[in-house]
Amino acid sequence: MRTYTPKPGDINRQWHVIDATDVVLGRLASQTAILLRGKHKATFASHMDMGDFVIIINAEKVALTGAKLEQKRAYRHSGYPGGLTSVNYAELLESNPVRAVEKAIKGMLPKNSLAAQQLGKLKVYRGAEHPHAAQQPKTFEITQVAQ
């Protein structure tokens, strides 16, 4: 018996919408990375982009546990000498919550050329509105442990 390898035409992509209200950022990122990679499908192949489209709404209401809000820092570099800047997550979530969520999800995707393709299927929105109603996304519930 031969191993089944999915063809690009066999891939069936769905749209999922996730409400990030009071969801812990790490749990949100790991579940979203699984959907973006396609690991929830029986026909998963690590060398192909099998994943679904994911819409995350209410990114500004995402939760961080413990003291991460003040202690965890997000770094970026301008490319110039001495151009390293950092900001804690309290300031980052206030100014740009979309970037905080995208950064967490990007860190949970593989570090290869497929990651950019998979990250392109991620749509993050600050509020509850999104322009993808025509795609008829299914709601995806993330099970929570009580905080």
From Swiss-Prot:
Read off the CDD domains from this record.
Answer: Ribosomal_L13
* SUPFAM superfamilies assigned: Ribosomal protein L13 (SSF52161)
Recorded GO molecular functions are:
mRNA binding; structural constituent of ribosome
Top-level taxon in the UniProt lineage? Bacteria
Pfam families per the UniProt record, alphabetical: Ribosomal_L13 (PF00572)
Quote a single Gene Ontology cellular component term: cytosolic large ribosomal subunit
Sorted alphabetically, the Gene Ontology BP terms of this entry are: negative regulation of translation; translation
**What Gene3D superfamilies does this protein map onto?**
Ribosomal protein L13 (3.90.1180.10)
Is Glycosyltransferase tagged as a keyword?
A: no
Determine if Ribosomal protein is one of this entry's keywords.
Answer: yes
For this UniProt record, give its keywords in alphabetical order, as a comma-separated list.
Ribonucleoprotein, Ribosomal protein
Q: Which family does it belong to?
A: Belongs to the universal ribosomal protein uL13 family.
> Which HAMAP family has this protein been placed in?
Ribosomal_uL13
Biological role stated in the UniProt entry: This protein is one of the early assembly proteins of the 50S ribosomal subunit, although it is not seen to bind rRNA by itself. It is important during the early stages of 50S assembly.
Please give the subunit comment from the record: Part of the 50S ribosomal subunit.
This protein's name: Large ribosomal subunit protein uL13
Species in which this protein is naturally found = Pseudarthrobacter chlorophenolicus (strain ATCC 700700 / DSM 12829 / CIP 107037 / JCM 12360 / KCTC 9906 / NCIMB 13794 / A6)
